[in-house]
Structure formats: structure tokens, C-alpha cells
């Protein structure tokens, strides 16, 4: 009996002491949290030169640009709510001017089975931008086009089409003044890799194939009005505003990968240390 009680006690103490130890940063968690107290968030970019295959590409890019402006403040709000940072600021720079100024190159990558676009930015321009805004690091978020193979099922789940589909994806990095990438999205430090897309630009037209008694299912692009309606679907935020459901899915995923380490009771793991230190002063 004493042995069982002791084992349970040791397990409980271990959970209280270590919590969930997973680190999603490219540096040790404690180093990141000490280094990045004030985070700047650049206005969300759209990379019109990426793999966006929609026949009305210009209209689509303009639509994304408009929705970036409408929703980017919610990303800042969600990052603030993590409690990881002392302050999170949305930079006031113009996204269309800032992106080409900062961009060094883009690479199509396939890492650990995840296809994505990785962005590289000019160190000197980044250093200047951070100094101008008085932030410790900056988060750079880019909406881009990406084509990847998928198996998509019909609404009745009886048929599927495995093909290459064009998507709107989101890539992001948190970079310091020395140009070091401290955190990135997609994030390869997850136990189970996941990389949700912002929006599927194409769909398999099962209904047309059925209507024409055909086994040939065409892959079609969604219309601009249809895409606009999808982006316009809103949900309430924790504040008084609203955010597009599409963006909220991505923002929530990003914010979850920047949560501070928690103890068993849901508090920050370092809260006890901070309170103890304050009491000794």
C-alpha cells in the first residue's frame, strides 16, 4: 500500500515539476522567453509570385490582401492571450511595400513529408525594422500558393479523387535582429506533424461526373465570389470583434505553438519561481 501511494506521489510531483516539456522553438524555451519580451508582428503578406494557379489570380490576390488587413489584428490578440510576451505590437508598415523590401528568396520545400514554401529575409533590413519599431523579434506571416497531392472524397464518401490540388497556405517565422529564425510555421517540432491549409482553391466535381454518367472527375477552381463568401464567414472573438473562420483556424494553431509551459494546475511553470523571487527581495 505504501509503495502504491509513493508511486502516485512521485508521479504527481513529476507532473507538477516538469509539466508538458515540449518545445516548439528553435532555441531552448527559457532562452526564447527571456530574449523575446516584445514581439512585433508585420502586416500579413501575400506572395503573388508563388504557386497560385487560379485563372483570376489578380482578383484572388487582391481578395487575400483585403482579408489580411481585416483579420491580422486578431493574430496579435491571440498572441497576447498566450501570456508568453510582455507586449505584442502590429507594425504599421505597408505590407505591399515591406514584403519586397525584406524578401531575399522563397524555396519550395518538402521536409518530413510536408510540402511548404519557406521564406528567407534580408538580415540588414530586418535589423533596421526591429530597431525602428523597438521590438525584440518580428513575426513574418505570408499567405502563398501551394500545390500538393490529396485524396478528396465525395459528399457521400463513396467516391474519391486522388490528384494535385492548389491551395492557399500560410508560412511564418519569428526572426531576431541577427536574422536567426527562432520559431517557424509549419512547425517541425510537433510530436505529430500537421500543416492545415488556409483555403482549398480547387475541388473535384463529382456531381458533374455523375450527371454525365462519367468516370472522369474534373478538378475545378472555385469562383472568386465563392471564395469571397468563404472568407467572409465570421465568428466572434473573445473581445468584441469578429474574425474570419478561415484565418482563426490558422491563428489558433500558431498561437498554440507559442503557449508558455504550464504546470498541472494550468499556471505558468515559472510563476512559482517568480513569486518566490519577489518575496525574497
Label each region the model flagged.
Residues 21-35, 40, 49, 148-151, ...:
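C-terminal/domain-edge helix-coil "capping" segments
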Residues 25, 119-126, 153-159:
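N-terminal post-signal-peptidase region of extra-cytosolic proteins
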Residues 44-47, 142-148:
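Generic short beta-strand segments
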Residues 54-145, 175-195, 200:
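N-terminal segment of the mature soluble domain
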Residues 24-77:
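Start-of-domain marker
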Residues 16-19:
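C-terminal motif of bacterial Sec signal peptides marking the signal peptidase cleavage site
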Residues 58-61, 154-162:
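Short helix/strand-bridging catalytic loops that position acidic/His residues to coordinate divalent metals
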Residues 1-9:
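Bacterial N-terminal signal peptides that target proteins for export
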Amino acid at each position: 500500500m505504501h509503495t502504491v501511494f509513493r508511486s502516485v506521489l512521485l508521479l504527481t510531483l513529476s507532473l507538477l515539476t516538469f509539466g508538458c516539456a515540449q518545445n516548439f522553438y528553435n532555441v531552448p524555451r527559457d532562452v526564447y522567453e527571456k530574449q523575446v519580451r516584445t514581439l512585433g508582428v508585420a502586416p500579413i503578406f501575400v506572395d503573388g509570385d508563388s504557386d497560385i494557379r487560379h485563372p483570376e489570380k489578380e482578383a484572388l490576390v487582391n481578395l487575400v490582401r483585403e482579408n489580411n488587413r481585416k483579420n491580422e489584428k486578431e493574430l496579435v490578440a491571440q498572441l497576447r492571450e498566450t501570456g508568453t510576451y510582455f507586449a505584442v505590437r502590429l507594425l504599421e508598415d505597408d505590407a505591399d511595400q515591406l514584403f519586397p523590401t525584406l524578401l531575399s528568396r522563397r524555396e519550395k520545400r518538402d521536409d518530413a513529408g510536408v510540402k511548404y514554401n519557406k521564406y528567407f529575409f534580408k538580415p540588414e533590413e530586418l535589423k533596421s525594422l526591429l530597431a525602428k519599431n523597438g521590438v525584440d523579434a518580428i513575426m513574418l506571416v505570408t499567405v502563398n500558393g501551394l500545390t500538393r497531392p490529396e485524396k478528396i472524397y465525395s459528399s457521400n464518401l463513396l467516391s474519391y479523387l486522388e490528384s494535385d490540388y492548389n491551395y492557399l497556405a500560410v508560412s511564418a517565422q519569428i526572426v531576431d535582429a541577427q536574422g536567426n529564425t527562432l520559431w517557424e510555421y509549419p512547425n517541425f517540432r510537433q510530436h505529430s506533424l500537421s500543416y492545415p491549409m488556409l483555403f482549398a482553391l480547387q475541388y473535384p466535381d463529382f456531381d458533374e461526373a455523375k450527371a454525365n454518367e462519367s468516370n472522369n472527375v474534373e478538378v475545378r477552381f472555385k469562383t472568386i465570389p465563392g471564395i469571397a463568401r468563404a472568407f467572409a464567414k465570421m465568428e466572434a472573438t473573445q473581445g468584441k470583434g469578429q474574425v474570419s473562420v478561415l484565418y482563426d483556424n490558422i491563428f489558433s494553431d500558431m498561437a498554440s505553438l507559442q503557449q508558455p509551459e504550464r504546470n498541472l494546475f494550468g499556471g505558468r511553470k515559472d510563476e512559482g519561481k517568480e513569486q518566490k523571487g519577489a518575496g525574497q527581495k
